[in-house]
Curated annotation (Swiss-Prot):
Membrane topology note: Peripheral membrane protein
Native source species: Aspergillus fumigatus (strain ATCC MYA-4609 / CBS 101355 / FGSC A1100 / Af293)
Cited InterPro entries: Atg17, ATG17-like_dom
Family: Belongs to the ATG17 family.
GO biological process: autophagosome assembly; mitophagy; pexophagy; piecemeal microautophagy of the nucleus
Location of the protein in the cell: Cytoplasm; Preautophagosomal structure membrane
Keyword Transcription belongs to the record: no
One of the record's GO cellular component terms: phagophore assembly site membrane
Predominant place of localization: cytoplasm
Protein name: Autophagy-related protein 17
One Pfam family recorded for the sequence: ATG17_like
Molecular function terms from GO: molecular adaptor activity; protein kinase activator activity
Region Disordered, annotated ranges: 1-25, 204-225, 502-524
Low complexity: bias regions: 205-225
Length: 551
């Protein structure tokens, strides 16, 4: 729109003197000029868009400043959070490894205990099933098993001690599991907060991507603020251009007022039309000036006289500008619409950054609370379980060794009983051999005695009458007789079957000291049980099988 105006001339209206007929026909009608003045006045309402443009620029600049601060704070917190999260998950992994390692070791020890206890119970059951042969016991006594000779109080006490250790370890493990579950709940809560953070970041990234003129998508987890300065610059350019366009509308309005006032009868109309002008605001590029003030000054200013040519030139410019005024108004509206859209994107990015910052601070506060209050408890619970397990593992290992010793003792008892049966059979066999030797010897001694008696009697008959009786007093004595006398064997130290650890080796001197001197048996021969051959063969087979298993 041209800013040309007519030259200043004196006079309040167009003079009639000297006007040519053609010139009068070419002059515009007053109502036409008034319609242009009314349209120019209406176009000045675009000043509201310019005022809104200034508000948008101010709001966008404040949003950009806030985004820079929030983005910097968020980036700083994220770096700290990444380190804390790595440390937190490392602690959780270590605590879980302690739990799994302890659980595995405990399960292995329990399996060993179960195996040892099963072997011991099987041995005890064999003791119950093994009935002592009645030949070993006094006549009339109720049947007894080998288990009747075993004191199980040691087994019961050992089981009680092992149960106490197992219960304590199980309780410590349950406490650790509960602590780990609480730890997992903490991590789940943090994971949910991270999900909120990622959702906000994804939303912000999509908004940032959609607001950019480029078609490429953003993969950043944080919305980029690199596009916001260009947006702000675009808004400032729009605001500046809108101010310039508004100035051109003001100049067009001034020109319309001047033209109407220079037209006969137009002064009063100009004052009537311009009596209720919109409140003006400072226009960019013209800081310190006010549109309303400027218009009022123009309305009240005295008119300078114009020549016909100057007037005609002014009218031509007015008509040309009037044709463009509507386009200028539309351009201002388009620009304010574009600015509103850009501001919406800027504020959306600011809100997204706020959401990310709030999510980040929530995670940071959660981690801070966790690290200062609950995390030390989770770590302490893992250390407590480790300490309890080490203590009870030593006790359980000792109990496992005791179970093995008891099983060995009772297996030795079973083996000794089978050995006793074989020993009885051996002694029976020896006794039979001794009796045979005694019978054979008695028979030979009796033969020798009879032969000696016969020979002595023959000698006495043949030679006795010739020998004086005092030549040898023993000549008439009968031959000596030999008798066998049974002597009881000395008793040896009894064998203790209750505690192999308390048995001590007996030296030869101790054996000699503990052995009683042989005495004549007053109760008859040693009683050797008469065992069935089948029983002896079974005992011998078991001994042989155990010896084979041992190798």
């Amino acid at each position: 729109m041209s800013s040309s105006e007519s030259s200043s001339v004196s006079g309040g209206g167009r003079p009639d003197a000297g006007r040519l007929p053609g010139e009068e026909q070419a002059m515009p009608r007053l109502d036409t000029l008034i319609s242009h003045l009314v349209a120019a006045k209406r176009s000045l309402s675009s000043i509201n868009h310019v005022w809104r443009a200034n508000e948008i620029v101010t709001a966008a600049r404040a949003a950009l400043e806030e985004c820079v601060v929030v983005s910097a704070r968020t980036a700083f917190l994220r770096r700290g959070l990444n380190n804390q999260l790595r440390l937190l998950y490392s602690v959780r992994t270590e605590v879980e490894e302690i739990s799994l390692r302890g659980r595995s070791e405990f399960a292995a020890v329990l399996k060993d205990l179960d195996d040892a206890d099963t072997r011991l119970r099987r041995t005890l059951e064999l003791l119950r099933e093994t009935i002592v042969h009645p030949a070993f016991r006094p006549e009339g006594e109720d049947p007894k098993s080998l288990h009747d000779f075993v004191d199980e109080r040691g087994v019961e006490e050992l089981h009680a001690a092992l149960k106490s250790s197992i219960d304590r370890t199980t309780a410590a493990q349950a406490q650790l599991d509960s602590s780990n579950h609480a730890f997992d709940d903490e991590l789940l809560s943090i994971k949910e907060a991270l999900g909120t953070y990622r959702t906000a970041a994804k939303l912000a990234s999509s908004r940032s991507s959609s607001s950019a003129s480029s078609s490429s998508t953003s993969n950043s987890s944080l919305p980029s603020i690199s596009t916001m300065p260009s947006m702000l610059h675009s808004l400032e350019m729009h605001a500046q251009e809108m101010a310039n366009l508004l100035e051109s509308l003001v100049r067009h309005f001034d020109l319309c007022v001047t033209a109407v006032k220079h037209t006969e009868g137009g002064g009063a109309a100009a004052k009537s039309i311009t009596g209720d002008m919109p409140v003006g605001v400072p226009v960019s590029g013209r800081m310190g000036s006010n549109i309303e003030e400027e218009i009022n000054n123009n309305l009240n200013a005295p008119l300078d006289p114009l020549s016909n040519s100057e007037y005609q030139e002014m009218v031509n410019v007015l008509f040309k500008d009037a044709a463009e005024a509507e386009d200028v108004v539309m351009e201002i509206q388009d620009r304010i619409g574009e600015m509103e859209s850009v501001l919406e994107n800027v504020l959306a990015q600011r809100d997204a950054l706020r959401s990310i910052y709030n999510a980040t601070t929530d995670i940071y506060q959660h981690l801070s609370s966790l690290g200062s209050t609950r995390l030390p408890g989770y770590i302490a619970q893992a250390h407590n379980f480790t300490q309890v397990w080490h203590e009870e593992n030593d006790r359980i290992s000792g109990g496992l060794a005791d179970l093995s010793d008891l099983n060995s003792l009772y297996n030795g008892f079973l083996d000794a009983y089978d050995g006793l049966i074989v020993e009885v059979a051996r002694r029976k066999h020896v006794r039979q051999r001794v009796e045979k030797v005694l019978r054979d010897t008695r028979h030979k001694l009796d033969q020798l005695y009879e032969e000696d008696v016969t020979a002595r009697e023959t000698f006495r008959v043949e030679k006795g009458d010739y020998l004086p009786s005092d030549i040898w007093p023993e000549i008439g004595r009968e031959p000596m007789r030999i008798e066998f006398r049974r002597i009881s064997g000395a008793k040896v130290q009894a064998v203790n079957l209750q505690s192999p650890n308390e048995q001590e080796a007996i030296t030869d001197e101790q054996k000699t000291a503990n052995r009683l001197a042989p005495v004549e048996s007053k109760d008859g021969d040693e009683i050797i049980p008469d065992l069935p051959r089948e029983l002896v063969e079974q005992a011998f087979a078991r001994l042989k099988a155990r010896a084979k298993d041992a190798t």
